[in-house]
């Protein structure tokens, strides 16, 4: 572990410096990492720039995920695109369809003669971004999955010593937390489509969409209005009456409800771990997602969120050599260990995970391995390997609108999810027609 800490400190020190040789070939990466995550990005980029003198990577923050993807598309049309762009997972099908715009990572590595072993990467992470024959299209960067964060002090006050394992227990534990005065509400959530519908589906091994959630064809259709989905969403809506569940908003907007001690549990991205450590004044645990025991005997696997690095065409051969070297650097065991241990994201390589696991890190940081275990403890099924759906950025907006209508009592779960399926399928057909 001392060796790991020593080399991680080297990565940090290198990131404090900037600039390489004046004649270095310039390469550019547009990303969506702000705040502390942006600082970690700059540390890694600084380390790469100081590790060699041939290339200089310039990292440019372009706003949130949607803004970054939109900016890259506009830049490509204007022939002013960066070499690399960070795109969130829901943009995967859209990027794959843009065959004239993307330079597949596996092909770039081969063309530039850069050694590249895909078996190094955690299968549950890279599977989302590969072709049907296992070729990597983009390099996973900030990968996460939804988990349960729980307030240990509140649980102790309520006479509870562990997180709920099932949704049945979520209701029971929440009511006990409220009645004991330990918290105002039981739980809140974030990224609601991702956590309460997409991962809910894979965790229960039920289809979110036909055609293996889009992996097997563009003629996929949504089916997240099944009886199990309706039951789940309606239960959440009903739980609002007793403060068992409280909606705090999209993305991470509900996090303050947990950080301020109002809600005793938070279901959101594992990537928020670092931020919660800074914003909470109590010890909290991290546990796996709950499942409906009335529906399944045990859960399947969750899927990743976050984003991946796509290489865009239009650069020179020498520039792509620099991009390939940068991606090799990004995959370095110590760079990945630094990224994993300093953020809430999972490592993308088996080496970085094993290095961390064999140290005392997980013993000293309880729950930091939950995300990896939750994603990879079982081989994925056709229902749980991920989603590959066109126009999904816009479809996520539809899901947010319909879920918020349900939370507000304007629609039942059956009507709201049915409307979301109908509206979403129209966008799927539009994508299919455009990419036949």
Language-model features: where?
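Hinge/lid segment of periplasmic solute-binding proteins
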Residues: 88-145, 165, 198-202, 228, ...
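Extracytoplasmic/periplasmic substrate-recognition and gating elements
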Residues: 51, 78, 135, 156-158, ...
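C-terminal capping/gating helix-and-loop segments adjacent to ligand/active sites or protein-protein/ligand interfaces
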Residues: 367-423
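Glycine-centered hinge/linker elements that transmit conformational signals in sensory
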Residues: 174-176, 217-248
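A structural signal for short loop-to-beta-strand junctions that line the ligand-binding cleft
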Residues: 74, 82-83, 114-154, 185, ...
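Short, solvent-exposed loop/beta-turn-alpha elements that line the ligand-binding surface or hinge
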Residues: 106-121, 206-231, 278-279, 291-301, ...
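Extracytoplasmic "Venus flytrap"/periplasmic binding protein-like
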Residues: 43-121, 153-165, 264-265, 275, ...
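Extracytoplasmic/periplasmic solute-binding protein
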Residues: 132-141, 146, 171-221, 263
């Amino acid at each position: 572990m001392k060796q790991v800490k020593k080399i991680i400190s080297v990565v940090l020190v290198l990131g404090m410096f900037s600039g390489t040789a004046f004649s270095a070939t310039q390469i550019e990466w547009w990303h969506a990492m702000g705040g502390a995550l942006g600082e970690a990005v700059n540390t890694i980029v600084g380390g790469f720039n100081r590790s060699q003198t041939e290339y200089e990577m310039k990292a440019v923050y372009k706003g949130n995920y949607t803004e970054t993807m939109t900016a890259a598309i506009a830049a490509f049309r204007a022939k002013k695109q960066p070499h690399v762009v960070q795109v969130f997972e829901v943009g995967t099908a859209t990027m794959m369809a843009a065959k004239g715009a993307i330079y597949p990572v596996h092909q770039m590595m081969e063309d530039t003669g850069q050694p590249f072993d895909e078996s190094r990467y955690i299968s549950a992470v890279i599977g989302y971004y590969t072709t049907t024959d296992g070729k990597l299209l983009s390099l996973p960067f900030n990968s996460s999955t939804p988990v349960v964060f729980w307030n240990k002090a509140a649980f102790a006050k309520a006479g509870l010593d562990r997180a709920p394992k099932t949704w049945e227990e979520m209701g029971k534990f929440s009511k006990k937390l409220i009645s004991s005065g330990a918290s105002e509400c039981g739980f809140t959530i974030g990224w609601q489509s991702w956590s309460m519908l997409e991962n809910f589906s894979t965790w229960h091994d039920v289809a979110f969409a036909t055609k293996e959630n889009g992996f097997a064809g563009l003629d996929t259709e949504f089916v997240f209005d099944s009886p199990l989905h309706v039951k789940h969403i309606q239960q959440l809506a009903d739980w609002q009456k007793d403060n068992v569940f409280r909606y705090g908003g999209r993305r991470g907007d509900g996090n303050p409800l947990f950080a301020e001690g109002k809600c005793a549990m938070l279901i959101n991205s594992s990537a928020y771990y670092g931020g919660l450590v800074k914003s909470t004044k109590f010890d909290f645990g991290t546990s796996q997602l709950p499942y409906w025991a009335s529906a399944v005997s045990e859960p399947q696997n969750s899927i990743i969120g976050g984003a991946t690095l796509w290489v865009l065409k239009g650069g020179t051969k020498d520039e792509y050599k620099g991009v390939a070297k940068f991606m090799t650097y990004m995959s370095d065991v110590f760079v990945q260990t630094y990224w994993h241990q300093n953020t809430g994201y999972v490592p993308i390589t088996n080496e970085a995970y094993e290095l961390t696991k064999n140290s005392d890190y997980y013993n000293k940081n309880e729950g930091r391995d939950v995300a990896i275990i939750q994603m990879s403890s079982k081989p994925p099924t056709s229902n749980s390997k991920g989603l590959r759906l066109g126009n999904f950025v816009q479809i996520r907006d539809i899901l947010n609108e319909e879920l918020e209508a349900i939370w507000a009592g304007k629609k039942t779960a059956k009507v709201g999810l049915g409307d979301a399926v109908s509206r979403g399928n129209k966008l799927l057909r539009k994508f299919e027609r455009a990419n036949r």
